[in-house]
């Protein structure tokens, strides 16, 4: 619903290979102008390939070529209309090729450890002591993690780079609870 209520989106299009999802999406007001091919519908399908399929289909079948494309993954449903509109405003203001939503990481990267099959603990990046993370939490550098809620791409940049994180990528910081 956040996408349908956003004033910055011309169209809300769902890409799916599932008839039930397509019907529900249309019932709630989204468009499903095509069904996603099965080769782009498995767990290992790269997002960029799914996006490129949608862009090409819309261009070839409707002569529709948007300036921006926003990926809103259904696995991150807590984004708001305001999040969508603010991330779009950031893209315009910064002339960004991409805006991706993030949240402050709960853990410092150097506190992340690996555990072997026999339960032995080892450093992932480097020793927390060597990394200087035994300082107060307030004095540490902040780190951010992708939260999967918003991926906004300038379509021409996506087509040129064929990658999800082009050079001119900015972040839209969301609160941890979303």
Predicted regions and their residues:
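Short, structured coil segments at secondary-structure junctions
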Residues: 8, 28-30, 117
